[in-house]
């Protein structure tokens, strides 16, 4: 009788433990999904980040006009529509210098393991990017789509992976949102430009940066 009671008691305890583990797993999955949602940028956030700051009218400056650096404009025209793998090391560095003071946003876009395929949890961010770049306020500008990795893995491997992933984002935007491919320049930097150099393996380093190269000084009325 006692043994039977002990067996039933043990069975009940195991059942409770199993239920607890299941609930914990479900809660963990739900929290992971919520965290992924929190990291996805909205269309509005992207639009605000990539829209050049409005500046007051000055003498000789009409609404919507801006003064572009001729050399900068020439370089932008040279790289328009280029794919990441077609860029030389010098061109990559020139792009990095060009975009320093331009409107930009870092998107935490994840990809399937060892792949350039966009993960399902990051699709909302890429779709929001597509809608933002389709907005009339941004149409006509040339954008840099730059892929970055963390410090894990070899230099050449990360360089290749970052290029393929940047090109994957461009392909998605062109095919799904009809963005003009000439308005998108893809570039990969591998592990060469860490966002958080103090923590080279940090998730923040694995990102896609989008930059509006035509930082137009749109004058406000």
Where are these regions (language model features)?
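Accessory regions outside conserved functional cores
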Residues: 2, 19, 35-39
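Bacterial N-terminal signal peptides that target proteins for export
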Residues: 2-17
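Bacterial N-terminal signal peptides
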Residues: 15-26
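Sec/Tat signal peptide C-region and signal peptidase I cleavage site
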Residues: 26-32
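A residue-level signal for beta-strand positions that form part of recognition/binding surfaces
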Residues: 29, 104, 108, 142, ...
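Periplasmic peptidoglycan-binding/tethering modules of Gram-negative envelope proteins
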Residues: 35-142, 215-221
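Periplasmic OmpA-like peptidoglycan-binding domain that tethers envelope proteins to the cell wall
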Residues: 148-221
């Amino acid at each position: 009788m006692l043994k039977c009671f002990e067996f039933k008691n043990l069975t009940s305890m195991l059942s409770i433990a199993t239920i607890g583990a299941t609930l914990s797993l479900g809660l963990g999955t739900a929290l992971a999904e919520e965290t992924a949602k929190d990291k996805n940028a909205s269309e509005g956030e992207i639009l605000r980040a990539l829209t050049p700051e409005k500046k007051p009218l000055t003498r000789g400056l009409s609404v919507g006009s801006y003064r572009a650096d001729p050399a900068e404009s020439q370089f932008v025209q040279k790289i328009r529509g280029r794919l990441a793998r077609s860029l030389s090391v010098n061109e990559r560095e020139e792009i990095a210098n060009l975009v320093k003071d331009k409107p930009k946003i870092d998107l935490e876009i994840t990809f399937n393991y060892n792949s350039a395929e966009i993960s399902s949890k990051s699709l909302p961010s890429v779709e929001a990017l597509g809608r933002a770049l389709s907005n009339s306020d941004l149409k006509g500008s040339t954008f840099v789509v730059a892929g970055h990795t963390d410090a894990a893995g070899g230099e050449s491997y990360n360089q290749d992976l970052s290029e393929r992933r940047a090109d994957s984002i461009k392909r998605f935007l062109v095919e799904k949102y009809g963005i003009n491919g000439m308005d998108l320049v893809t570039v990969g930097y591998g592990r060469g430009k860490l966002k958080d150099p103090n923590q080279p393996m940090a998730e923040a380093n694995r990102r896609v940066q989008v930059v509006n190269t035509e930082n137009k000084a749109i004058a406000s009325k």
